[in-house]
UniProtKB/Swiss-Prot annotation:
Assembly behavior: Homopentamer. The base of the pyramid faces outward.
Cellular component GO terms, alphabetical: bacterial microcompartment
Localization (cell): Bacterial microcompartment
Name of the molecule in the record: Bacterial microcompartment shell vertex protein
Species this protein is from: Haliangium ochraceum (strain DSM 14365 / JCM 11303 / SMP-2)
């Protein structure tokens, strides 16, 4: 899984039928402090995340291992909303 920050939403009025009803969010990989570091990825949202939240997302076949995405054509899925990141005994990120 990868730490990421939700930076936007994606709306598609016409979709492949198997992804109908999925919430799609734009996520950028981030460092343990929550600062975005990478390019944006469109993720299916399995947990109800929102813009500005730090999340864990998985890609590839792991992205299709949730109840929401099972057997659906998705390549990245938000699996968790992060509350706290601790590294070496130091809190690097804490959700407000």
């Amino acid at each position: 899984m990868v730490l990421g920050k939700v930076v936007g939403t994606v709306v598609a009025s016409r979709k492949e039928p198997r992804i109908e009803g999925l919430s799609l969010l734009l996520v950028r990989a981030c460092d343990p402090d929550g600062t975005p570091t990478g390019g944006a990825v469109v993720c299916a949202d399995a947990v109800g995340a929102g813009v500005g939240e730090v999340v864990l997302y998985a890609s590839g076949s792991s992205a299709r291992q949730t109840e929401v995405t099972n057997n659906r054509p998705v390549d990245a899925t938000i699996m968790a909303i992060v509350d706290l990141v601790e590294m070496g005994g130091d809190v690097r990120f804490r959700k407000d």
